[in-house]
């Protein structure tokens, strides 16, 4: 039997999962690593921590599976997107800590780009908005704030990469400087229409082309690991950013299929096929995956607060001790009350993109208690998903006639209550898969596809297994009343922003 090793390098931990040829899991390992917050709004990682934790979990997973390097057909990598590393081409030493996707230090750079009228051309070419979230301005900041870095970059001495690229470079002993199209599409430097780094974008943001990696298919022979890492060389044959990898792991290969990943926040992607749809509703247009030189696109929406709303119930209010208590508690709520939580704890993401507003509760009465607050917190995740759903269907009219499928993954999907309410408010089935490790599975599939372990996408999709389908069970009148109440609550929060 052949095995595939998936590296899932995340924001707070590195994970490795060994998949069998039938996509069942043979072993898994995880290791957390330190977070660094040197200033307000700044988030950094030590690149060496990313590297050492990744190697450690790979070795642990291989040992747990009772296999050796010769049994592993390929390695697939998936990663926290946008996080930026710049290192010395000769020594391999990072010139600065990795600047994490959450980091907001480049807000002034972004504001200047907008003030200079650069957003239309950047958005048209990249499908993104100008925001510190993305890699390009992070690279520019490093070049301008590390002494001598910009001059060194101009001389070709420095390399840039997202986390996948950095790991690939280290795994191959510094032989391969490459990334895939999904990660490239999150940099503000990549033209999603041509599939290439864009000279105009590089000039606008101030990043030398010599720093950039080669962009390849998501399933491709990137190189092989140096033998002394895992007891033998292993082909590295698949790379994708974490949300795109989850889309692949959910087998969302048909246009109109949509996945939502629920963790601290929520990321939803809608497959739009070979057409890059330009959003008119503040969604992002991104590369879902690239196979055989052909790009498949997606609309993406980001929700900042999903699972963290439940954490707030536990840590902020103290009304629960464990997340699993929220569903039963919500079931006890008074059906006559209409309490809405708009959880804009750190502003609002798509489709509103307002970083200034803050959260609010609406509809409180003397009888409002823990059950009603739990109900409102769980429903807020569903309402926010509905907003993304509605924006996506407005941006891509084909979804009105296509068979729209919502597949969910992430820790919060363990809540049957939340998933049922999600189906009710979307008026669409919500599918929860048997394999919840969808992000790692996506990376494994891309690697295994290139290595000949896994079949082409349509056949792989046949192996996707449903654990539970949540079917809508709410009257149209109730659904419309509840959604109208949510819309009023959001309007109230947005109106509270003096800059609105």
Curated annotation (Swiss-Prot):
Keywords from the UniProt entry: ATP-binding, Glycerol metabolism, Kinase, Nucleotide-binding, Transferase
E.C. no: 2.7.1.30
Domain of life, source organism: Bacteria
Function (record text): Key enzyme in the regulation of glycerol uptake and metabolism. Catalyzes the phosphorylation of glycerol to yield sn-glycerol 3-phosphate.
Name of the gene: glpK
Name the UniProt record assigns to this protein: Glycerol kinase
Binding residues for glycerol: 81-82, 133, 242-243
GO cellular component: cytosol
Binding locations of ATP: 11-13, 264, 307, 311, 411
Broad EC category: transferase
PANTHER family on file: GLYCEROL KINASE, SUGAR KINASE
């Amino acid at each position: 039997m052949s095995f595939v090793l998936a590296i899932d390098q995340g924001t707070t931990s590195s994970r490795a999962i060994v998949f069998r040829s039938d996509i069942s899991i043979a072993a898994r390992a995880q290791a957390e690593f330190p977070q660094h917050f040197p200033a307000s709004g700044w988030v950094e990682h030590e690149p060496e921590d990313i590297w050492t934790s990744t190697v450690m979990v790979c070795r642990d997973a291989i040992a747990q599976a009772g296999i050796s390097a010769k049994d592993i057909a390929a390695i697939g990598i998936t990663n926290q997107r946008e996080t930026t590393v710049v290192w010395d081409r000769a020594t391999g030493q990072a010139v600065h800590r990795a600047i994490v996707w959450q980091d907001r230090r480049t807000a002034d750079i972004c504001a200047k780009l907008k003030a200079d009228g650069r957003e239309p051309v950047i958005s048209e070419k990249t499908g993104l908005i100008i925001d510190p979230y993305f890699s390009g301005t992070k690279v520019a900041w490093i070049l301008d704030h590390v002494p001598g870095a910009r001059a060194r970059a101009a001389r070709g001495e420095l390399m840039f990469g997202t986390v996948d690229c950095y790991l690939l470079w280290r795994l191959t002993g510094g032989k391969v400087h490459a990334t895939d199209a999904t990660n490239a599409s999150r940099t503000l430097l990549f033209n999603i229409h041509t599939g290439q780094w864009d000279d105009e974008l590089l000039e606008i943001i101030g990043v030398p082309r010599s720093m950039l990696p080669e962009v390849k298919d998501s399933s491709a022979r990137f190189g092989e690991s140096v033998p002394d890492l895992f007891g033998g060389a292993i082909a590295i044959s698949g790379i994708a950013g974490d949300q795109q990898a989850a889309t692949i792991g959910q087998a969302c290969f048909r246009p109109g299929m949509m996945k939502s990943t629920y963790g601290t926040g929520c990321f939803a992607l809608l497959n739009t096929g070979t057409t890059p749809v330009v959003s008119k509703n503040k969604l992002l247009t991104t590369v879902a995956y690239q196979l055989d030189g052909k790009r498949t696109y997606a609309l993406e929406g980001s929700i900042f607060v999903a699972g963290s709303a439940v954490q707030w119930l536990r840590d902020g209010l103290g009304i629960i001790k464990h997340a699993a208590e929220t569903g039963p508690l919500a079931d006890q709520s008074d059906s006559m009350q209409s309490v809405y939580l708009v959880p804009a704890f750190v502003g609002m993401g798509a489709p509103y993109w307002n970083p200034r507003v803050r959260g609010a509760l609406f509809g409180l009465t003397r009888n409002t208690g823990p059950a009603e607050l739990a109900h409102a917190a769980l429903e807020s995740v569903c309402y926010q998903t509905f907003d993304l759903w509605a924006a996506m269907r407005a941006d891509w009219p084909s979804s009105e006639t296509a068979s729209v499928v919502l597949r969910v993954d992430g820790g919060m999907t363990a809540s049957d209550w939340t998933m049922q309410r999600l189906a009710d408010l979307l008026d669409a089935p919500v599918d929860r898969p048997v394999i919840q490790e969808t992000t790692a599975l996506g990376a494994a599939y891309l690697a295994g596809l290139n290595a000949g372990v896994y079949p082409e996408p349509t056949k792989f999709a046949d192996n996707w297994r449903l654990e539970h389908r949540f079917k809508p069970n709410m009257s149209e009148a109730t659904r419309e009343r509840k959604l109208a109440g949510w819309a009023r609550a959001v309007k109230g929060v947005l109106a509270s922003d003096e800059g609105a």
